[in-house]
Amino acid sequence: MTGVAVQTIDHVTVAAPSELEDAVIEWYSQVLGFERLAKPEGTSSSGAWFRAGNVQLHVTIEPAPPARVGHFGVVVDDLDGAVEQLRAAGSGIEPARTIPGRRRCYTRDPAGNTIEILSYDGVTDA
């Protein structure tokens, strides 16, 4: 094997402006159901850290609007149920191009960061 021997992804970071800090933290905790973690000593008091499975999500608070490039994806067992819950929470759903063997769509957190929601149970989109 060539290159760096990466073992896994440890965390993904998304940014939010300070005026949306509470809304973004609540969204990841209440809407997506991520487990909120205690932040290590020496890190910023703003923002929050979460865990979903073996990967962490770090929310940082930035003075400028966050970049709208890229996204991260989360796997769910029931895409239709997840879409229903996201819509009930007021989150928009954007369709995604079909990829064989998976169903998927996109949503955004209150700061506009894009999250792909996917399941490996079919080939049609939400």
What is the role of each PLM region?
Residues M1-I25, G70-F72, T124-A126:
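N-terminal beta-strand motif that seeds the catalytic metal site of vicinal oxygen chelate
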Residues N54-H58, G112-I115:
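Short, charged/polar, Gly/Pro-enriched secondary-structure boundary elements
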Residues V14-Q56:
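Core segments of cupin and vicinal oxygen chelate
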Residues M1-Q7, I9-S18, A48, E62-R87, A89-A126, ...:
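Vicinal oxygen chelate
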Residues G42, E62-P63, Y120:
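Residue-level structural signal for beta-strand termini and adjacent loop
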